[in-house]
Curated annotation (Swiss-Prot):
Keyword Nucleotide-binding: no
Any one GO CC term of the record: endoplasmic reticulum
Its job: Guanine nucleotide-binding proteins (G proteins) are involved as modulators or transducers in various transmembrane signaling systems. The beta and gamma chains are required for the GTPase activity, for replacement of GDP by GTP, and for G protein-effector interaction.
Organism: Oryza sativa subsp. indica (Rice)
Name assigned to this protein: Guanine nucleotide-binding protein subunit beta
Subunit relationships: G proteins are composed of 3 units, alpha, beta and gamma. Interacts with the gamma subunits RGG1 and RGG2.
Source taxonomy: Eukaryota, Viridiplantae, Streptophyta, Embryophyta, Tracheophyta
Keywords: Cell membrane, Membrane, Repeat, Transducer, WD repeat
Length: 380
């Protein structure tokens, strides 16, 4: 029987072999991919998106949380935002008036994620309690203004890092977790429909931090993980991942489908955002900033979102910056962190309204901010 030392040696050798093969595969793919988005766009005479510092302004600051803001989501149809904070509350905001319509005290204060149902009548949240709680906003509130939990989805063996409703389906929700899995739930019954990963060899090998459902093909979703990979899943086939995407060198904190559903973007601890082709698996572009003057390490990318056309990529960073990238030319056209009334802490979350008229950012400074183009122009 092999000793522990021998097993460790074999494991180290196998790991080195896998890493070597992965690097050879990356180099081979790079040889076959004769260009990237940025170089091709320049050959076609594309010019950068033009921005002035006064074009995008902070028109609202939403104050009400007493702890770090961790997550936010826009309702699909109306001008409402839900936010989750370290203070153990969910707050539902009217984005037009800055008024709070609900301030829900959670039974577990360690919340990490929140999401609106497609009809805007319910919100979901999850965190370190390993559960996903559903609240019906039409429920009768108690004397303190709190509303009861309508459903608790239990089954994960680790923290719930992200949740998202399947588009146009109020009864279907997908969660990602520190137990290395994603789960499709029936919200009505509270039952798990499918588990993605776990004992299956094609699943993630570390905590799953983020997910994004394809709005064009709602059967498909991607998940980003601490194993530095993204996996594509088909909710009809839970037994295996459709494809695995490599390229990052750190935890993947955020994934988001491109508006056309044919590509997706990522944001990582390695300080870069990347754009991948869903079908081919090719990495199309890397969006990387220069290191800070006093620090050789790049700030972490915490959250990303695309404009409705896909021409702009919004990326929040751990140092409080929020870059607006031109996705075609891989250039930063604006940094919201340099504008008046910007955040004073880490950007933890961000999201674009469904009509593309406004961007909302959340921060560890306890505030949310709504950004819009001056002159009421939509974000391109």
């Amino acid at each position: 029987m092999a000793s522990v030392a021998e097993l460790k040696e074999k494991h180290a050798a196998a790991t080195a072999s896998v890493n070597s093969l992965r690097e050879r595969l990356r180099q081979r793919r790079q040889m076959l991919l004769d260009t990237d988005v940025e170089r091709y766009s320049r050959t076609q005479g594309r010019t950068p998106v033009s921005f002035n510092p006064t074009d995008l302004v902070c028109c609202r600051t939403l104050q009400g949380h007493s702890g770090k803001v961790y997550s936010l989501d826009w309702t699909p149809e109306k001008n409402w935002i839900v936010s989750a904070s370290q203070d153990g509350r969910l707050i539902v905001w009217n984005a037009l008036t800055s008024q709070k319509t609900h301030a829900i005290k959670l039974h577990c204060p360690w919340v990490m994620t929140c999401a609106f149902a497609p009809n805007g009548q319910s919100v979901a949240c999850g965190g370190l309690d390993s559960a996903c709680s559903i609240f019906n906003l039409n429920s009768q509130a108690d004397r303190d203004g709190n509303i009861p939990v309508s459903r608790i989805l239990t089954g994960h063996k680790g923290y719930v890092s992200s949740c998202q409703y399947v588009p146009d389906q109020e009864t279907r929700l997908i969660t990602s977790s520190g137990d290395q899995t994603c789960v499709l739930w029936d919200v009505t019954t509270g039952q798990r429909i499918s588990i993605f990963g776990g004992e299956f060899p094609s699943g993630h090998t570390a905590d799953v931090l983020s997910l994004s459902i394809n709005s064009s093909i709602s059967n498909m979703f991607v998940s980003g993980s601490c194993d530095a990979t993204v996996r594509l899943w088909d909710i009809r086939i839970a037994s295996r991942a459709v494809r695995t995407y490599h390229g990052h060198e750190g935890d993947i904190n955020s994934v988001k489908f491109f508006p056309d559903g044919q590509r997706f973007g990522t944001g990582s601890d390695d300080g870069t955002c990347r754009l991948f082709d869903v079908r081919t698996g090719h990495q199309l572009q890397v969006y990387s900033r220069e290191p800070d003057r006093n620090d050789n390490e790049l700030p972490t990318v915490t959250s990303i979102a695309f404009s409705i056309s896909g021409r702009l990529l919004f990326a929040g960073y751990s140092n409080g910056d929020c870059y607006v990238w031109d996705t075609l030319l891989a250039e930063v056209v604006l940094n919201l962190g340099n504008l008046q009334n910007s955040h004073e802490g880490r950007i933890s979350c961000l999201g674009l309204s469904s009509d593309g008229s406004a961007l909302c950012t959340g921060s560890w400074d306890k505030n949310l901010k709504i950004w819009a183009f001056s002159g009421h122009r939509k974000i391109v």
